[in-house]
Amino acid sequence: MRPAEQERPPFWQRRPGLRVERHRATMAHLASVYPCHTDASLGDRGPYIGVNVTGGASGWFFDPFELYGHALTNPNCIVTGDIGSGKSALVKAFLRRELAVYGRRRMVTILDPKGEYTPFAAAHDLPVIRLHPGGTDRLNPMDHRGERTETHRRQNLATALVSGVLGRALDATEDALLGWAVSTLARTGRTFTIADVAATVADPADDLVALSRRSPLELAQAATPVVFALDKLLTRTLAGMFDGPTSVRVDWTNGPGFVIDLSAVYDDEDALPLVMLAATSWLAASLQRHDDRRVLQIIDEAWAAVRHGARHFQGSLKLSRTYGVSTWLVCHRPADLSAQTDDGTAIAKISSGLLSDVQTRIILRQPPDQVPVAAELFSLSERERGWIGQLARGRALWRLPSHGAVVQTVLTETEKQLCDTDTAMST
């Protein structure tokens, strides 16, 4: 309590200083002004990311595999932010530090639709697989991975690709015919390609005709849309990229990883989602055959990967824990993962449901119209909702199941040149 006015000594006898009123408050409020307050963050295991702005400027360290089992129950991440928010720099700096901290215990695979990871790949000895129509590098999304469910995976992939070309779901006969073709080829035990699937559909074996309970002419008529769709995939959309056996060699045992450059088809809005679907399928099948290393899988422009293959892609995410793969979905807006099929259908619900398989949400600055969308998708508090529209460049809200913090990514001078896309463009 402040002493009564008559009890105060004359001003020449008073000690210098500022008289402060007594105030009582809880630590929930005082933590924001108390200079010695720090947040334990997530511990110090994993590479250093930056400064925990909401935790007294303590360090922020992160590795999805180190946190698995106590802070996380799945290793997948989503990174979303407006253009120029520092999204690309954060991801590249994280990958660079993962390779520096863990060496060959980590493998980095990057699906790069825009071709912006080429300098990063050169600096870290990551080979670049450049896919373009008429090229020499080919990946076979029908490659076998030795699982009992392999036939089912390949059937789903074929269905997703053909549905994407047709722009509609397959009817019962089309779906059955395509499934029969894949299972027939799978039973041979030999490696087959999409071209083999097309040939089998166009000229079905007698047992397939008998199984369909239709005449050869009726079956041929029913199969016509599928035949034309597969022909378009092989002669245009996937030509020279996914129409033959895998021709690239990857060091799965000791190599640091690789980049798949899809920039040749980035401007083709019809082809890019199908190419992304085929590439992610090949990547998932390959990674699941080599499960002795922890893998960081980056899917840039993730909206394209789920546009036609949400169900197929969700299946891969669910297997991340089994095969030691942390998938990072990178997009401008969180709504990108659901807006492609936001029509109330089962596929739309699956697209939105992808977020349930992603426990680490890294949200950089959002444009005003996306703040309500992000708040709903990520179940943000009112305070967090206010933050994400005002975050400074390089600053992100990290949301984990039991922890949340605003973190400023800290870049070295080398990383600013190598990882920061905007800096590289301005120099």
Summary of predicted features, one role per range:
Residues 60, 70-72, 88, 119, ...:
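Short helix/loop capping segments that flank catalytic or ligand/cofactor-binding pockets
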Residues 47-133:
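Glycine-rich phosphate-binding loop of nucleotide-binding enzymes
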Residues 31-54, 118-127, 133, 140-325, ...:
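P-loop NTPase motor domains
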Residues 48, 61, 78, 109-110, ...:
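Structured core elements
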Residues 150-196, 342-427:
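P-loop NTPase motor core of the ASCE superfamily
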Residues 117-120, 137-140, 336-340, 370-374, ...:
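Switch/connector loops and helix/strand junctions flanking conserved nucleotide-binding motifs
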Residues 1-80, 414:
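Basic- and hydrophobic-enriched, low-structure N-terminal and domain-boundary segments
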Residues 72-85, 92-96, 111, 263-387, ...:
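Conserved P-loop NTPase motor cores
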